[in-house]
Amino acid sequence: CKTKVLQRFFIAKNNKRKHRFLHVPHFIRLNTFNTDAEKESVISLQLMAGGPITVADQHNTIGDNLKFYQNEEMLALNTDRFVGKPLLRNVRDEKSQIWYGQMSNGDYVVGFFNRDNEPKKRSLQFSEIGIEGARKVRDLWKHQDEGETDKLEVEVGAHECKIVRLSK
């Protein structure tokens, strides 16, 4: 039986059916991933999709992976009830590997992912996601401010991600 990441259920109200979605996360065992980049990516995608982080590592297998589960800047997405979405839904288009969403305070979070086995360039004009003008950029994994701009061009390594917060 395959585990469904997203289950649909219906709620009848006033004789109308409304679709509701329940995020059912996979339990994450970071010790099963080969690189730190893959560990960051799996946690990032879960949080960008609006899901919680569920730890399945055991005390004897977690090793030094606890740091990935404790990134306060990334966990703030879950605390804020952030839910992002892919720029495009066509999985054959590389823009589908760019995710974005808006936090309750108006900041945007953008995730650049790379599912491929070789480095890829990703670019985004902020106007593509409804942002006019420049924003301050902060890398949420490196905990570094990266200046102010109205576009981003990044090289993302194989199975890596780059998650940034854009603020006024």
Predicted feature descriptions by range:
Residues C1-H143, E153-L166:
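Active-site-proximal substrate-binding groove within the catalytic cores of carbohydrate-active enzymes
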Residues E148-L152:
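Short, solvent-exposed S/T- and G/P-enriched segments that are highly enriched in secreted/extracellular
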